[in-house]
Amino acid sequence: MAATEDTLYALIDPLLTGMGYELVGIEYGGPAGKRLLRIYIDSPDGITLDDCETCSRQISAVLDVEDPIPGEYTLEISSPGLDRPIFKASDYDRFAGEQIKIRLSAPWEGRRRFKGVLAGLGDEGVRVVEAQGDEVQIPLDLIEKARLILEP
């Protein structure tokens, strides 16, 4: 996690927790002038548009005061949705049994993309059972992006 994201987590996580929400993850990036700060939130009852608006106002107020991001950016508050991105190591166990798509930052065993059934977090990495039935353990530090997927 980049320093900016660490700072954002430190500012936003306690705020959302106090409001009864879970900070699922943070994405920040884009070209200069079009930077986007996307914050994923969740709650046991799910997320409504009103929840997103409430959290947006509270988070925006904190970010205006603390000013952790230089320059202009757009703040977007979102639920993780059904094709939920995975940000936390604990989520690999939490969503075991679900379909997952993983993209790596560098090739591992000759590949950068994996897809299959999430089997949890093992000693050597994220366990995924691929379509042909083989289980792979992907090193956690190589995972650039992971997302649950819906399969018909």
Curated annotation (Swiss-Prot):
Signal peptide bounds: none
Stored Gene3D superfamilies: Ribosome maturation factor RimP, C-terminal domain, RimP-like superfamily, N-terminal
Pfam family, one: RimP_N
The entry's keywords: Cytoplasm, Ribosome biogenesis
InterPro entries: Ribosome_maturation_RimP, RimP_C, RimP_C_sf, RimP_N, RimP_N_sf
HAMAP family given in the database record: RimP (MF_01077)
PANTHER family xrefs: RIBOSOME MATURATION FACTOR RIMP
Family the UniProt entry places it in: Belongs to the RimP family.
The name this protein goes by in its record: Ribosome maturation factor RimP
Organism per entry: Alkalilimnicola ehrlichii (strain ATCC BAA-1101 / DSM 17681 / MLHE-1)
Lineage: Bacteria, Pseudomonadati, Pseudomonadota, Gammaproteobacteria, Chromatiales
Encoding gene (name): rimP
